């Protein structure tokens, strides 16, 4: 059950990419420390929501074990993470959608709670992590009432989550450059380098 002290949110785990840096392998299903990457995220976020969504474009039968429901891009050409965010916003049951990439297993509960607590301060605006001054839109918290504005930007041809969220008044949770919790393990080398880290 979700923590009642935090605002109710749906959570979207993005696992819909082509995995180009992994030689075409499905990143969310690659093992790290004995479990698929998606399993690490599932274990972390499951207590925070009763509406866990996974965006995936293949291996749906395997991802189903880690989600309350699955969504897929409405285009078959892997149009990028904003497509998954749109799909998540379309089905989210709560006022907020917490967005996370499937290949960041080192993010921790404390950071997610900081992001969720920020929601109470400006309920009309999206929040993103900003690491060393760099916006990280795939670690974001989006009010679901902004779905139509995001859809409008998509129809205008914008495919960048950062470009779409910033004009909506996005706020930042500031982190130091190189914060290891945001490490995307999206190449074989990064997976190997982080394999022994807890």
Curated annotation (Swiss-Prot):
Binding residues annotated for GTP, in chain numbering: 14-16, 27, 73, 103
The protein's required cofactors: Mg(2+)
Gene (name only): mobA
Gene Ontology BP annotations: bis(molybdopterin guanine dinucleotide)molybdenum biosynthetic process
NCBIfam families: molyb_mobA (TIGR02665)
Binding site for Mg(2+): 103
The reaction(s) this protein catalyses: Mo-molybdopterin + GTP + H(+) = Mo-molybdopterin guanine dinucleotide + diphosphate
Entry's Gene Ontology cellular component terms: cytoplasm
Enzyme type, top EC level: transferase
Protein function: Transfers a GMP moiety from GTP to Mo-molybdopterin (Mo-MPT) cofactor (Moco or molybdenum cofactor) to form Mo-molybdopterin guanine dinucleotide (Mo-MGD) cofactor.
Domain description: The N-terminal domain determines nucleotide recognition and specific binding, while the C-terminal domain determines the specific binding to the target protein.
Assembly behavior: Monomer.
Species whose genome carries this gene: Pseudomonas aeruginosa (strain LESB58)
GO molecular function ontology, one term from the record: molybdenum cofactor guanylyltransferase activity
Protein name: Molybdenum cofactor guanylyltransferase
Keywords attached to this entry: Cytoplasm, GTP-binding, Magnesium, Metal-binding, Molybdenum cofactor biosynthesis, Nucleotide-binding, Transferase
Family listed: Belongs to the MobA family.
